[in-house]
Swiss-Prot record:
Residues 228-329 form the HD domain. This is Multifunctional CCA protein. Mg(2+) binds at residues 21, 23. InterPro entries: CCA_bact, HD/PDEase_dom, HD_domain, NT_sf, PolA_pol_head_dom, PolyA_RNA-bd, tRNA_CCA-adding_enzyme. Its cofactor is Mg(2+); Ni(2+). A single active site specifically recognizes both ATP and CTP and is responsible for their addition. CTP binds at residues 8, 11, 91, 137, 140. Pfam families: HD, PolyA_pol, PolyA_pol_RNAbd. HAMAP family: CCA_bact_type1, CCA_bact_type2. PROSITE patterns: HD (PS51831). The gene is cca.
């Protein structure tokens, strides 16, 4: 029995990155061997064991053979005669198919180190096409390692295109698509994930609402990049610069999906894209089974991001209605999330990445004024039942009117 460190831990060592988890492969052993040594079996589909002291995962060397459709349609063979090279052969990318023995010697039968040095994400074998999940995983790795200069190797991208065209992606469950997407949205440059999916044709299959935006023009005076799809990825990139909140990043990604449904006869203008976007975002989130907080923010951003751009011109009553709709009184974090998404939209334009966004400070100040109206004071003044909310709204509106009048007076005095 021999054990080898495999996968991400070996890859990250040669990239000089911190190791998150260490996974091990055991060659020349049967389940009974590990159980006798105190390992705890946790794997259902194939034997995975927890080390009795370190609790790290040890898996018996195995091979996989396609036996059905989708990413779960595999039969697994594990026995003492399975070699390390056979186990590594079933892995997705060469940089993930390296191992180290107990003396720290690299075992690299498929050229992973060379691809790592050349910053290439390359498939290990033609069996890559048997698992549709690998399309998403490669796109995610491309986004994760893009800051280090990694790109998808041309032959691997060609296989991903083939898989997208042949309908294999239809076998991916919504939960798995969202899981991979959520991981990508948590990374430093999630826009690369969606760009790679578009390059291989998977975006049209898995995220048609986003894919449809490419080629849809916007007015050049407002959008120097013109293409709404490009603007969408720029907005996602800016949102990722401003916040690590997955909900903010997803809402930035979907903020303009309604522009894919507007009448081409009126392009490059997109009147009514907000309400159209709300319907699409709702359908998209239902299909992907996104968490409710992610869905709710995306719906609000799709409908109201343009209104926030004009917040300095809004009447006090409209401003209060916006704050009520965002539900800032019960969910104050929503205000900052909405502001970040709108700022990402404004700055996610070619050449305008560094422009200020004064609407952010204005909306925060407006909220601060309205929030100073305390419900306890309304109750102390004798209001009861439904009258409490009515009076609260009246006082908040008056606070906004007074504040806005003072703002305008100060501007006129300059």
């Amino acid at each position: 029995m021999k054990t080898y460190l495999v996968g991400g831990a070996v890859r990250d060592k040669y990239l000089q990155l911190p190791t998150q988890d260490r996974d091990w492969v055991v060659v020349g052993a049967a389940p009974q061997t590990l159980l006798a040594q105190g390992y705890q079996q946790v794997g259902k589909d194939f034997p995975v064991f927890l080390h009795p002291r370190s609790k790290e995962e040890y898996a018996l060397a195995r091979t996989e053979r396609k036996a059905g459709q989708g990413y779960t349609g595999f039969s697994t063979y594990f026995a003492p005669d399975v070699t390390l090279e056979q186990d590594l052969l079933r892995r997705d990318l060469t940089i993930n198919a390296m191992a180290e023995d107990d003396e720290g010697q690299l075992i690299d039968p498929y050229g992973g180190l060379q691809d790592l040095q050349q910053r290439q994400l390359r498939h290990v074998s033609e069996a890559f096409v048997e698992d549709p999940l690998r399309v998403l995983r490669v796109a995610r790795f491309a986004a994760r390692f893009a800051p280090l200069g990694f790109e998808v190797a041309a032959p691997t991208l060609a296989l991903m295109q083939q898989m997208s065209q042949q309908g294999e992606l239809a076998h991916l469950t919504p939960e798995r698509v969202w899981l991979e997407t959520e991981k990508a949205l948590s990374g430093p440059v999630p826009q690369v994930y969606f760009q790679v999916l578009r390059d291989c044709g998977a975006l049209a299959v898995l995220f048609p609402e986003i894919d449809r935006l490419f080629g849809v023009p916007a007015p050049a005076q407002w959008h120097p990049e013109i293409d709404t799809g490009i603007h969408t990825l720029l907005t996602l990139a800016m949102a990722s610069h401003l916040s690590d909140d997955v909900a903010v990043r997803f809402a930035a990604l979907t903020h303009d999906v309604g522009k894919g449904l507007t009448n081409p006869n009126f392009w490059p203008h997109h009147h009514g894209h907000g309400p159209a976007g709300v319907r699409l975002v709702r359908e998209m989130c239902q299909r992907l089974r996104t968490p409710n907080p992610v869905r709710d923010l995306a719906l609000l951003v799709a409908e109201y991001h343009d209104l926030i751009h004009t917040v300095e011109r809004l009447r006090p009553a409209t401003l209060l209605k916006l704050l009520d709709t965002i539900d800032v009184w019960r969910r104050p974090q929503r205000l900052q999330q909405m502001i970040l998404c709108s700022e990402a939209d404004a700055r996610g334009r070619t050449g305008l990445e560094d422009q200020p966004y004064p609407q952010a400070g204005y909306l925060r100040a407006a909220y601060h004024q309205a929030a100073q109206v305390a419900v306890c004071n309304v109750i102390t003044d004798g209001f009861q039942g439904a009258a409490i909310r009515e009076e609260l709204q009246t006082r908040r509106l008056q606070a906004l009117k007074s504040w806005k009048a003072a703002q305008e007076a100060a501007l006129n005095a300059e």
